[in-house]
Amino acid sequence: METKLHVNLGQNSYDIRIAPGLLADVAQGIRPVYPEGRVFVVTDEHVDALYGAKVMGSLEGAGYRPGKLVLPPGEKTKAYATMVYRAMADAKLTRKDLVLTLGGGVIGDLGGFAAATYLRGLPFVQVPTSLLAQVDSSVGGKVGVDLPEGKNLVGAFYQPKAVLIDPESLQTLPDRFFRDGMA
């Protein structure tokens, strides 16, 4: 059973879709906001091992042309903005291409910030896999990166085109991250 919530922000409005199995059918989840073209997936090593093949297979099977950047997991990754920009440049992304963030809040923040600022803004879709990202960071429109001087010192307000939440991803979440999301 699917639940759909609409975030009404005028021109920046978007839907949040919540349904078991969305990770296996992510292509159909993005189709309403991005019917065709290239999709650049930003994820981390842990999430990629769990869901990367499933998401890439869904995108390829639906005719999208996906690329992927896999980063180390953890908060320190939010300092990797230059690496994301270089990967986007190497992929020759244009303003018509979509960025898809697949992971927890760190990946959503970093990938969303890169989408907001690369070529002055690429469309992006959040696919959060942690409880905290599903209930908080993926739906607030705040994206940012860290500096050595502190967390989230550089950022933007940039709304996703959609948020796709598969509650089944919580089954692979370590207990401490589940507790973080409940707090």
Q: Which residues make up each language-model segment?
A:
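Short, basic, helix/turn surface patches
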Residues: 91-102, 151-157
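Acidic-aromatic/histidine active-site loop/patch
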Residues: 105
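Catalytic nucleophile loop
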Residues: 108
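A glycine/threonine-rich phosphate-anchoring loop and its flanking beta-alpha core
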Residues: 113-183
